[in-house]
Amino acid sequence: NIIDNDIVIIAIDEKSISALGRWPWSRDYHSQLIDSLQDVQPQALGFNLLFTESGEYKEADRRFKNSIENSSFPVIMPVLQKTKYNDFYFSTHNTLLSTVDMTADPDGVIRRVRLIDDGYEIFLPQLSLQAYWATHDAGFQSNTIYDEVLIDYSFNKKTDFKKISYIDVLQGNYTREDFFGKIILVGVTAVALGDRFATPITTSHSSISIHAQVLNNI
């Protein structure tokens, strides 16, 4: 399975935590991230972050919502459940909802994923499937779309998905070619923040990289 160069990860890494401070961050940073990418024209941007807690400032939530609404590309937001802390993006026309749930096998290893989750009030596609739908006019047809599918992992240190540090994006340390026409996934890679799982090929794999693997399979 060959790595798709059109999938790029914006990494919430140790470098970004050191620069921006304690996690979770103000949603103003996410607003700045979306705004800074407007001119480079990615295909879509998906967050692997659950906004289930109160933001520090209501104005920051408002600015985040405005950045999503005014974005030139669709923004994919995961949802665990609708709360008073995340309802600001349920009412945003440019938001595509998704789920980021993953269930390990009994031995703790992530080998498979359900592309459509019907455990909500609505059917929610996985982040990876929603990203595919957002960027392919033909959609995705499969008899197994409601089943769990095995993940075909492709990973080694020399051929992994391109990762660009979150702080580098905020500071403009990237080229247009890094993101033009790309599908961007935003998520945690800093080991101290957790959100890591065992896979058949690694003992500790960031969940954002697993979502990228699933998108790569589709």
Residues of each region from the PLM?
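Non-transmembrane functional regions of envelope-associated proteins
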Residues: 1-144, 179-218
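Substrate-access "cap/lid" subdomains that shape
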Residues: 138-174
